[in-house]
Amino acid sequence: FPTVHRNLALAYYNVKKQPQRAYEEMEKAFALDETDARVYLELDQLKKRMNIPVSERLEDMEKHFTLVESRDDLYLEYVTLLNTLGESEKALNLIKARKFHQWEGGEGKVAAQYLTALYQLAKAAAAEGEYVEAKTILLQAVDEYPQNLGEGKLESAQENNLYYLLGLAQEKLGETEEAFASLTKACHGESEPVGMMYYNDQPPEMIYYQGLAY
């Protein structure tokens, strides 16, 4: 009865505060039915809470990739792990290859990984002196989102990091006016850190890029 072990896992974690016992029960639940993508997602989320190394989680997901492909939230978690480990080109290709459908609690998450992948690729290109490539990638990042992401860009989107790096690339290319415009955009936003209550609130780290842009 895999569901019994899954429910026991939730009780051990949420009520008894025994994460290791919860992990053991969730592993049993999945072992009894390795076709249950939801239980696999919950197992991975438990691994995240228990600080299981990202590389281990990624390796396990690759062993169960059919399950990963069956759910948008699992697929996006896999992409997130790739971005975390610096495999941004692979992450971006996987994002482009899938048609996402928004789910409750998932607002903004697909776009966030899309932008993370592009930013990291642009940063790597700039570090190698490939400023034209970096600029091309960043112009893609600040443009409208591809339709397959399942969500559009909000007017309040905070892209200070993107515009800051774009401004630097344009500056290196001798595009003075364009660089000034980009760095000016990088200065926009709240100047004091506040707690993020909603997915579209300004991330505190954007203030750092505002400071750099000034």
Stretches found by the model and what they are:
Residues 10-11, 45, 80, 123, ...:
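Residue-level recognition of tetratricopeptide repeat
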Residues 15-28, 50-63, 87-93, 133, ...:
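Structural signature of tandem alpha-helical TPR/SEL1-like repeats
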Residues 27-31, 63-66, 100, 143, ...:
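Conserved structural position within tetratricopeptide repeats
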Residues 34, 69-70, 103, 146, ...:
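Short coil turns that delineate tetratricopeptide repeat
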